[in-house]
Structures are given as structure tokens and as C-alpha cells.
Amino acid sequence: MEQEQDTPWTQSTEHINIQKKGSGQQTQRLGRPNLTQLMDHYLRIMSQVDMHKQTVSWKQWPSLKNPTQGSLKTRALKRWKSFNKQGWTN
């Protein structure tokens, strides 16, 4: 049987199954996660990333405690114009 190399992804998602041998000693076997476990892991990570993005975006706009539609539109247009001035040179 071919042994696969562990990666950070497999190490973080693999679950340890403990099996008892006939002599009473315990051995650990790393099992592959099922699809539900992978989806749970993915959704947990993505929700953490989303929360971080929301926090960062509000920290970038500290003056907007109660933004109006006009102020948001003005700010967005300024950002769009500055982006277009830079062009695709970056």
C-alpha cells in the first residue's frame, strides 16, 4: 500500500481514530475526512475570513459612522477614478 505524504491541509482535516489491539495497546490511525467534515472545515474557515474582511473594510472608513447614499457614492467614485489613473501598470 502506498503511503501519501502529509500536507498542512490533510494534517488539519484528518481525524485520529484510536483502535485497541488484542494486547490492550492503543495505536493511532489517521483517517481521511469525509465530505461533511471537509465542508464544515471549509465553511468555518470562510466565515472567519469573511468576518475579517468586514472588520478591515470598516476600519478603512472610520469617518463613516452613519453613511448616506450620497457620501458612499462620492467615495466610490473617487476610488474608481484613482484606480483608473493608475491603469493596469501595477
Curated annotation (Swiss-Prot):
Subcellular location: Host mitochondrion inner membrane; Host nucleus; Host cytoplasm, Host cytosol
Site (Low pathogenicity): 66
InterPro entries in the record: Flu_proapoptotic_PB1-F2 (IPR021045)
Primary localization: host cell
Cellular compartments per GO CC: host cell cytosol; host cell mitochondrial inner membrane; host cell nucleus; membrane
GO BP, sorted A to Z: symbiont-mediated perturbation of host apoptosis; symbiont-mediated suppression of host cytoplasmic pattern recognition receptor signaling pathway via inhibition of MAVS activity
Region Disordered: start-end pairs: 1-31
Protein keywords: Apoptosis, Host cytoplasm, Host membrane, Host mitochondrion, Host mitochondrion inner membrane, Host nucleus, Host-virus interaction, Inhibition of host innate immune response by virus, Inhibition of host MAVS by virus, Inhibition of host RLR pathway by virus, Membrane, Modulation of host cell apoptosis by virus, Viral immunoevasion
Superkingdom of origin organism: Viruses
Region (Mitochondrial targeting sequence): 65-87
Role this protein plays: Plays an important role in promoting lung pathology in both primary viral infection and secondary bacterial infection. Promotes alteration of mitochondrial morphology, dissipation of mitochondrial membrane potential, and cell death. Alternatively, inhibits the production of interferon in the infected cell at the level of host mitochondrial antiviral signaling MAVS. Its level of expression differs greatly depending on which cell type is infected, in a manner that is independent of the levels of expression of other viral proteins. Monocytic cells are more affected than epithelial cells.
Further information: Is not encoded in all strains, and seems to be dispensable for replication.
UniProt record similarity statement: Belongs to the influenza viruses PB1-F2 family.
Summary of subunit composition and partner proteins: Oligomer. Interacts with human SLC25A6/ANT3 and VDAC1. Interacts with host MAVS.
Record-given protein name: Protein PB1-F2
Organism: Influenza A virus (strain A/Memphis/101/1972 H3N2)
Gene: PB1
